[in-house]
């Protein structure tokens, strides 16, 4: 399961979602424009308030740059294996 915390106007959120869509994986988007949802996200990611925040199979992988780094180093497909059927 992939969870991505986003806001509607965040370009990094859009880039992260674009990469996940290109990988043909399903994800749950949690929009944190509401202060209560953002506080819940922040508590889950050790106080971070920036978006996106991405979880793959319950593991926090970081933000957009972290997701693209996983892709560049060839590690993203392995993390997504459960979701892609690889």
Where are these regions (language model features)?
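Local sequence-structure signature of Cys/Sec-based thiol-disulfide redox active-site neighborhoods
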Residues: 1-26
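Structural micro-motif
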Residues: 46-55, 65
